[in-house]
Amino acid sequence: KEGADIVRTTMDQIACVIAETEEAAARARDLIRVEYEDLPAVFDPIEAMQDGAPQLHADAKNNILVHYKVRTGDIEEGFADADIVIEGTYRTSWQEHAYLQPEAGLSYIDEEGRVTVEVAGQWTHKDQQQICHALDLPPEKVRVIYPAIGGAFGGREDMSVQIVLALATWKLGRPVKIIWSREESIRGHHKRHPYIIEAKWGAKRDGTLTAAKVRIISDAGAYAYTSTKVLGNAVMMCVGPYYFPNVHVDAYTVYTNNIPTGAFRGFGGPQGAFAAENQMNKLAAALGMDPVELRLKNVLREGVPTHVGTPLSPGVSMPEVIEECARRAGWRQEGENWRREKPPQPENGVKRRGIGFGAGFKNVGFSFGAPETANAIIELRGGAEIEEVILYHAGADVGQGAHTVFAQMAAEAVGVPVEKVRVVASDTATVGSSGSVSASRMTFMAGNSIRGAAEKALEAWRNEERPAIGNYTYHAPKTSMFDPETGHCYPNFSYGYVAQAVEVEVDVETGFVEVLNVVCADDVGKAINPQQVEGQIEGAIVQAHGYALMEDFQMRDGHVLTQHLSTYLIPGVLDVPRHVESVILEYAEPNGPFGARGMAEMPFIPYTPAVAAAIYDATGVWFDSQPMTPQRLVEAFRKAGLGN
């Protein structure tokens, strides 16, 4: 294929060795000699955008994969109306998914002659499509099966071992197995995008927001992956869940020779929120205004237009979520004013306590005009009464408990105990596509497809069909892409809403931050399985904790330096917050199944800026980059005259 002879990143695969043993494969690998012609490379996205920079792809001038613009109102007039202007440049880093099970898979020829790949992934039919494209095979010759596994977080959204497995079995006609080591996993799959966000906000003395000007640069790495979709989310979230009459955004995702970046829990939301919520907290401090009160003064409500010219989809609960989180965290409402006392301080002046607040919203589904569908088949078996319900669904279970929730929703839709439901899942040979298990979409999409299939199956049952089968494909409400000039669009059909209060204790001499308490209010629409919802909230907070304070992914000239979990530190049991209060709110999503909306990504989004605000509350020092490691904190504290 055109361009396939160019190595653009250390993640590119050069050769495939298949052997009977690992030792034989290693010996064969060591015999390979590759002749390279060195090409110029670029690793900084700002440098990559300049004229004369090395070009990674012929169709991307100045290495710009995409440029999104938003032009709403009159930005100059908005700043002229402002009494105060807050500016900041925010930088976020790569993040490794660090799921406990590294990439692995098995391939073979099944009884119908299909190349069959059993692997962990997030979209069976997309994996099938990409294998077919790579091997030039028709879909009926390729089968993909997903076993349930313990984690993905977006890291299994793109190709890893799937095509290599299929290629080996297709060529040899034999079963093939592959298991990546941890080092191979860290080097071999995409990461969360690093972002540079320059933000300038204007507001009146009473806290009314007047203008926001934002410039975003995202490092896509060497290939596109999901970078354009991640950037779209960041554009939506870079001004937070707040109303601005005047907005000017320029957002770019840029090719570099770094390893590719792609889907990761939050999908652009954490990067956008880090800038937006820091701006909001800085504005509150500059105005001498409570951060909760300032948010409630400007928060998006039902029918209020966003900065892309259209309101959020029906079912907006952001004000209620902020209020409930604040109350649970000790804020008091006095008329329109909100207040919270500063946490009591330790007697030892070395350690200081503070509390920070953050809010966020996140789309459910890819949206931005992408067609969103999910297929389900329900088969009812029995005689006079329904004795068994078989649900066929392609949705993957990647540790979030999707298949349990599928069974619960099928039982509710059919009207039988959940014990009568059997789920046949994640096999391209049994059911149509469900779309990706990502973007917090699967409960919403699967639930609606399951309800539709149940209605059809029950109708067939009433017509005396045995077995009674219902086959239904749900189509989500239509959305639209950014207008190329104004950015105006109807980007998403559903949203989830979250707010967090984080209390920390900071040691100004060592830079160590201990998170004492987290209150997380999350509107889930309807908690189909409350235990799983609570687990998702706590899991997202732990993962966000690593992003905020610990996980320092390092790359130099495209080479990953932190290839081991001994050098890339993720939270352990002694690192996580002491206490997490999960506040599960249920404001029904009008289009959601049983009122449910997606929720698993949302608790990640406001955590890092809430931690930054808590550190500021404790020490008076702002941090505009993450991770906020002890070394970086100590350096900043010393500059501020804190500690030794």
Show which residues each predicted segment covers:
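Active-site "cap" helix and flanking loop/linker of ATP-utilizing ligase/carboxylase catalytic domains
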Residues: 531-567
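Generic long, charged, amphipathic alpha-helical segments
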Residues: 422, 572-596
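Amphipathic, heptad-repeat alpha-helical segments used for oligomerization and assembly
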Residues: 267, 441, 585-603
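Cytochrome P450 core scaffold surrounding the K-helix E-X-X-R motif
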Residues: 525-529
